[in-house]
Amino acid sequence: SRLHAFKRMGVAYMTLCHNGDNELCDSAAGQGEWGGLSPFGREVVTEMNRIGMMIDVSHAADATFDDVIRLSRRPIVATHSSCRALCDHRRNLDDDRIRALAAQGGVMQICLYGGFINHDHPDGATLSDAVRHILHVIRLVGPNHVGIGSDFDGGGGLIGCQSAGEMIQITLRLLAEGLSDADIANIWGGNFMRVMDAQRLPLA
């Protein structure tokens, strides 16, 4: 009933957990209480699919991600996660999970939080580091499955991109890397909107 109330209020997506296991699932920062989704969490994912609410797997444990990918009949999102191949943090997605998310039509948004961008020098993480994460996803699965999730309200901000007023620098860097205007527009929101639109389609 709460999902339905959220939906009526205009909630477009829900993150399944934060920095700890809950009644739905295991968190990347938790103790692995459920081994992924709980039985109730499976019910919630199924109902979110039914009513057309996007599922956000940022903060989720690997086992939770895997359960969601297997269970969800709609594309999912990781609203603020980066690439584990470039920054070995449990909050980031490894290459196999990035591929799985993309194969389902989903999108991951690179998080501009230093600890998820540069493992060795989180306080010195730069805009260039973040651009490398974006390019890594593009090399793996193409430009239609990556976006940007600043997390400015959760500690985000990098050298060269500390606030919304500096985010134009990301566009300039992507142009310098040779990305097209259309690809950059998709990275800035088009990809996310595509997944949002997919929630309105009838389930197969």
Question: Where are the model-predicted features located?
Answer:
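Extended, charged catalytic domains and RNA/DNA-binding interfaces, predominantly
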Residues: 1-111, 115-118, 131, 135-138, ...
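Soluble non-cytosolic domains of exported or imported proteins
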Residues: 39, 124, 128, 161-165
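Beta-strand segments within the central parallel beta-sheet cores of soluble alpha/beta enzyme folds
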Residues: 77, 147-148, 185-189
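Active-site micro-motifs of SAM-dependent methyltransferase domains
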Residues: 83, 154, 194
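Short, solvent-exposed loop/turn segments at secondary-structure boundaries
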Residues: 88-90, 121-123, 158-162
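Short acidic/histidine-rich active-site segments
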Residues: 111-112, 141-164
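Mid-to-C-terminal alpha-helical segments outside catalytic/metal-binding sites
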Residues: 162-204
